[in-house]
Amino acid sequence: MTLDKFIDQAISPWMREEGPDKDIVMSSRIRLARNFANQTYPILAKEEKLVEIQEFIRDEYANKSFQTYKDLQYVPLTDLSPVEKSVLVEKHLISPHLIKHSDFAATLISENEQVSIMVNEEDHLRIQVYYPGLQLKTALEQSFALDDWLEEKVDYAFDETKGYLTSCPTNVGTGMRASVMMHLPALVLTKQINRLIPAISQFGLVVRGIYGEGSEALGNIFQVSNQITLGKSEQDIVDDLESVVHQLIEHERMARNHILERTGKKLEDRIFRSYGTLAYSRIIDSKEASKCISDVRLGIDLGLIDNTSGNILNELMVLTQPGFLQHYANRSLRPDERDVLRASVIRERLKLEE
């Protein structure tokens, strides 16, 4: 797969696959933070040291394959335009932090985009493995295997007492962030989410928006992840997160049934109005688009809409973001121009489903 395909395709190949509870849990991710032993962390390292790490990763891993993860493509961020960098963030293949320090940063991306390894982010390596639906345990197993493969050539910074050493103290220990992306429209509509988020934090977990820390929960999509990395094993962290996610799934399903029973016609009207907005509007901003896509996704999950697939909505969530729209237009766009193009892209994509 070429870099162009990473940029041009809105939906990653792995996202087209089925997964457990995929109507609510869109994806599972394991991210491991790792550093080279006896090397200064990227935020304090000299330029020549960052270049050394970049070149080592390129020479040892570019175009290599590990198990089902084929042809890891090495992409220096200096090769990308600002818009192309934004697209990779919108696809969750790199982080916003990596863009801010992109002069000596790079990423390795597998052919199916299920694996991305960020180089010289906050830590020397940030290893990400994604799976569709609720598959945290499988993602953990695969991330361990990938980590072991990398460690054959990389001497990690590790302390027998503290565990993996990281740039930020909150990652010391396992160096792991386990997270799931969840679509929770019924909990938002019934306002139960306001009660559940504080309760979740008491379990050492955190709830964020779609793009992680500091981001908004656009389209009723929430990221739930662990905060604690020290004093617990990776398996215990995943077990605790999975337990809470199962409870959230149950609450969301109950809320959906409750709304359907109590206000069936109103809910149906809301869903089809949103579908109409997506299908016919000429101008639409990102917030309204995200809200309407969420409504239509709910309609599909409840069996009210049968002529549109959930994958199309996953695709639209990326297609309608500012970076992707500007890539599509092949030029910078003012906000009002983006709103016009966004409406056009959505109309065209929905017509293909008819």
Curated annotation (Swiss-Prot):
Domain Phosphagen kinase C-terminal: start-end pairs:
24-255
- The EC number of this protein is 2.7.14.1
Sorted alphabetically, the Gene Ontology BP terms of this entry are: phosphocreatine biosynthetic process
Q: What class of enzyme is it?
A: transferase
Species classification? Bacteria, Bacillati, Bacillota, Bacilli, Bacillales
The residue numbers the entry assigns to motif RDXXRA motif of the pArg binding pocket involved in allosteric regulation are 338-343
Which gene is transcribed and translated to give this protein? mcsB
Q: What is this protein called?
A: Protein-arginine kinase
Task: Say yes or no: keyword Transferase present.
Answer: yes
One Pfam family named in its UniProt record: ATP-gua_Ptrans
User: Which GO molecular function, any one, fits this protein according to its record?
Assistant: protein kinase activity
**A GO cellular component entry from the record:** extracellular space
Species this chain originates from: Oceanobacillus iheyensis (strain DSM 14371 / CIP 107618 / JCM 11309 / KCTC 3954 / HTE831)
Q: Which family does it belong to?
A: Belongs to the ATP:guanido phosphotransferase family.
Q: Where does ATP bind?
A: 27-31, 92, 126, 177-181, 208-213
The UniProt activity regulation field reads: Appears to be allosterically activated by the binding of pArg-containing polypeptides to the pArg-binding pocket localized in the C-terminal domain of McsB.
